[in-house]
Amino acid sequence: MAAEPSPARAGAVALAPRVPGATYRLQLHQGFTFDDARRLVPYLDALGVTDLYASPYLRARPGSPHGYDIVDHGALNPEIGTAADHAALCAALEARGMGQILDVVPNHMGISHGQNRWWRDVLENGPGAAYADFFDIDWDPVKRELANRVLLPILADQYGQVLESGELVLTLEGGGFQVRYHDRVLPVSPESATDILAYRLDALAGTLAEGHPDLLEYQSILTGLRNLPARTETAPERVAERTREAEVLRRRLARLLEESEPVRLSVEETVRVLNGKRGDPRSFDLLDRLLDRQVYRLAYWRVAADEVNYRRFFDINELAALRMERPAVFRETHRLILRFVEEGKVTGLRVDHPDGLHDPARYFLALQQARLEQLSAVGGSSPAFEGGPDRERTGVEGTLVASPAGDVPAAAGVWPLYVLAEKVLGRGERMPTRWAIHGTTGYEFLATVGGLFVDPAGARPLTATYRAFTGLRTLYPDVVYASKQLILDVALSSELAVLGRALARLAERHRHSRDFTLRGLIHALREVIACFPLYRTYIDGTETTVELQDRACVEVAVAFAKRRNPATSASIFDFVKNVLLLRDPDSADEPYRQEQRAFVRKFQQVTAPVTAKGLEDTAFYRYNRLVSLNEVGSDPDRFGVSVEEFHQACATRQARWAAGLSATSTHDTKRSEDVRARISVLSELPTAWRSAVGRWHRLNQRHLTVVDGQAAPDRNDEYLLYQTLVGAWPLDPTPEGALAGFADRIQAYLTKATREAKVHTSWVSPNAEYDAAIRTFVARLLEPAPGNRFLLDFAAFHEPIARLGMLGSLAQTLLKICAPGVPDFYQGTELWNLCLVDPDNRGPVDFEARTRILAELSSRLAGEERVALAKDLLTRWRDGHMKLYLIHQALQYRRRRLALFREGEYVPLAVAGSRDEHVCAFARRRDTEAALVVVPRLCARLTEGGRGLPLGDAVWSDTVLALEGHFEATTYRELFTGASVESVPMEGGGRGLRLGALLADFPVALLEPSAGSRS
């Protein structure tokens, strides 16, 4: 069945955005191309997906597994396919009425291997480069030796050692010189090329007769290079002159080298001499002097944290941040993307890491403005953008864009382009209302729906077990604080230093703050950032007031920083707070205000990566109480979500962000939805878990290794390992089955986890002995030997966990499909998916098997009763066909009732009876249409610890779903089994549906009123 026709196609311009019905994320790379995706379109359509959700596919560095290291925003990635391949994929989607959401990367670009011509221009021409303003570079850093230069921390050893080992090689290619370092290629600046060309000039003059045309041309080229505008000249006309003349001289030299053998031999000999001779350190002096004249300063990679002077994506040296707030940068990076939008090939955008942008709100407005201009060009108009006085500047080329009235988020149809933000919301944080988007990528939904299956009663006993087993008593907020401080010290200290110097300049401008020292200000900033409760604020430097949420965030951070630093004067923290909240001193002039606002913008761009690295990539691997909570968008300190809290979140979502994605697994999640569902079961079985981990430690302590006088792995890492095994244990744990490669996966995962934790080993300073101890411990635990008592014990413990995890997975999947929002599926998760963090979750997916299974299910649906099919699938639940069946049936139903699920009212349904706390139920209602959703939760107590299934009256007893006058029908049809369920009178009046009847043969239910049935 084809999806609803796409309104945004070439020749048929839409006035409103296409909002997906359901999305499916595909990871495109050289191993999975446009052609591979095109072949999947019929399967995705049959599954019920309406929109393909594609990872970035613009030209990235060669071999990129993810596409986030784009080197050319104006071209497709040739490893993924040609323009014709891309067009064929888009045509296949269009033929079935499907849309495409493209993941776009505005924050940064890949710069590692010389393919990025913008970055190459910067390395060649410095501040005088045509693209110098495209990147966020501090041309006036603290270290004076780096003035008007870029630190390149790419060397594997100290610079002198690398130079004298002959690893830096000068080459002549065409009319230009380059420096090669293994697979990296760096340009030689035009003015410094004079050192090379002049080195043997006298010898060349002796070879060629005076007045020889080749010699005259050679000397003319030298003169031209010497007279180029300096690379520090940044006036546009001088930049253009330098660029133009340098290219002319390069071509002239290339032609001369090709035509004159004496010139070519002379230059080649110079290159040979400059490259030195290993074993003779002085022979590298000339090359050293040449390198010292370059825009870039080559350095050992370890110095990056302290001295790098270009903004990066987090602490990744190979990803340089873009200045997306500049009109030219926006225009050049979005030309191809917006062309795809205009042609209808792309119907929505997912914006990666908007928290890294200078001003996310203005960026999103610029996207909508660009789409509006496309619509206006063909005579269209969007009601949300019709004229009137209420208009707001985007800051991009001075264009104007109208805003929706009031402080209300945009609903579907308000903004002309469907846009999603990859925004991780902190606990209690609300989306910025000024963002011209339709929602997020769904991490807040992931946290809410996942928490519904965590038993709050397990918090105290699991905390006690964790502390007793590991000996750790540090509270989670303290773990986060220490982790963020560590990141500021070892990964992002250069960013902190830049902020500190900017704040010191600001302090010097006023008599009330000039006595604060640079050291004191850096310390205060470090503490405030470490105490920051959210990823970042969104204070607009063009306004004089700060929104309530931003103000509260700053005030909380400063208050906690004061509390943690009683020996530090409160006045310095108050100064930081006043600067961040735009509270100017009485005598502040306009230059002060401009500098203050520039500082605030920079500060906001630093807190986000510090939080991401400190929280997601450090604290989440240090605090292992219940690791299903250690997930992007989740809070490990929030132990469970009540049914009432879930309903409130869904109601808010329907009112504000009904077009946002509802995700349960993504390419960035630490664990798949099915892994988390299993681990969350431990919250229901704290006593059994405490006994099990104690027993396993005693069985496995003989496999520990002594490293630096301590047992390895330590107790915290061991505790993480056991939870990981609970979550990822194969469905076929036999030596011939999945267990064969399982040990390798767990070894790789635990190595990554312990390095991310940065306690005993790290990526920056790997501890080879500890890493080896981890691998040995895992290998011995999982060795399929007859005498391995641990495996036998673990398998027995895990059997009911797997069954209970299955129930949680099915329940959260149905909730995702039916709750407010757009259900999003990560590739492969329509069957059981027991993957861990990347790269484990980015492996190949067996789509042939999934296509075959879906066809078999469709065939069986046509030939047998639903109830028989449902019972059979439940009996053999381990093969995952049951999950695919649920997804297929629910998505198809959702597509048939799209208006109901997109616009319908969200109605929480009450449950009465002795098992009421084990049910989450709601209805979606629109006019005469309605659908009821019922799922079980916390099923361990219902099933004797997972030994059975929560089906029938024997389990549900007197529990009834109260209809409470919401619905007049007396009979309801259940989608998965086809059963008809009659309502019954309830004590105290009203009618209800018995849970034992709703969940008689299948563990979740999706119902609709039967036509013509009325009470």
Segments predicted by a language model, with ranges:
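Carbohydrate-interacting/catalytic domains
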Residues: M1-P62, G74, E79, A87, ...
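Aromatic- and acidic-residue-enriched segments that line the glycan-binding/catalytic groove
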Residues: S64-D72, H108-D138, Q369, R430-Y443, ...
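C-terminal EAL-domain catalytic cores of bacterial cyclic di-GMP phosphodiesterases
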Residues: A83-V105
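Short, glycine/charge-rich beta-strand/loop segments that flank catalytic centers
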Residues: V104-I111, V907-P908
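Conserved short loop/turn motifs at secondary-structure junctions
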Residues: N107, V351-L357, T875-R876
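Alpha-helical transmembrane segments and their helix-helix packing motifs
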Residues: I111, R467-G471, G500-R501
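Active-site region of glycoside hydrolase catalytic domains
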Residues: H113-L186
